[in-house]
Amino acid sequence: NNVKRSLRLLLIPLLILISPQAEPSSAQTPQLTSVKATKAHAIISLRLETGKQVFLDKSLSEPRGQACANCHQPEYAFADPRTVSPGAVSERAGTRNAPSLLYAALIPSFAYEDFLTPEGAEVYAHEGGLFWDGRARDLFEQVQQPFFNHKEMNLSSESELAHRLRRSSYSQKLKELVGARDWADDGLVTYHAYLCLVELLRSPVFRPFNSKFDAYRRGDQAILNEQELRGMKVYIEKGKCDDCHPLSATNWDPPLLSDFGFDNLGVPSSGKPDLGLGKHTGNPEEIGKFRSPSLRNVALTAPYMHNGSLKTLKEVVEFYNLRDTPHGRWKTTDFPNTVNRTDLGNLQLSQKEMDDLIAFLHCFTDRHLNTNASHESLNIDPEHAESNHAQSLLFPGWTHRLHRGFKAQKSDN
């Protein structure tokens, strides 16, 4: 983790220049007055509005009735309060808890990287990617999969999705993006729908950075009370939370509160054993490992862990503290051979320290969600287009994809 942080700190000066919290200046926010920039903003604005409509559209499932918003509800930080989410077919349900979509656009692309440990040893590890097992390299891959998963929206093909998009109330907006010449091309119709969803998830609505913790980092030292400050100390030191959910800006500024690495925490079994990352990579040493989530808005996203087996923040903290002690009360875990026995399980936190830590975890809640937790929180501000355009090169790798309709030159790289 320390090596990850030191490498990523090289990026922070550039990130700060376009951070949502950075003070505007002529150097940081040049006036994009060219015709090309104006056109780009218009396209992004149209994508944002269309992406919102796709996100809320219940006609894009079979049978109809299931939308992205069914499993990613604004009042729960765009997560799902149910252990697993029912699909379009009522007797089918997913096997994992639906994660929050907030800050998902900033999760680094799935990669296998080498790191140096503090002792100087070179190790290799997977990090990043979307879904609990990282199987989607980036957000563009992720937004496609739920449409065709038989436990989710249950469409049979891209042709079926394209047909429904052409019959939607927002079809003319989508057609404007696709172009009249290509409107009959199913692949291009769905391609642009995916881009619209990604553009929505990149917008400031999904990366507000306006929690009490953010205000504290910006210099409002009085905003945290004594218990929350004690909780921050527990978080960094005795609780070891900072090891995997660093408070420092290691991969984005403001921090995302995750290193996005993979670990087997030994969570209680729930249903069929889930291979996690190991199924995706085929590596037996990675069986049962899942990606570390961001802790932003964690107080709103219960239940917890990949299988929703821990129901409250209190239970999560108790699990980390007591898992390997005689006081542990949790079921057998699926894959004990790959469980992390070093960093959690017997933290020896007192009840007061656990209470303080929970109080601090509530400081990660974006404050607008406390007052505007509904579909109205998907309101798109025209300035979002400029924000998305200005930051486009710093979002993870999907932005550099070739258009599906282009013929790529073969590369030796």
Locate predicted features.
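Post-cleavage N-terminal segment of exported redox proteins
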Residues: N2-V54, Q145, H150, N154-L229, ...
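Charge-dense polyanion-binding interfaces
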Residues: T332-R341
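Short glycine/threonine-rich turn/loop motifs
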Residues: T29-Q142, N210-T332, A373-N413
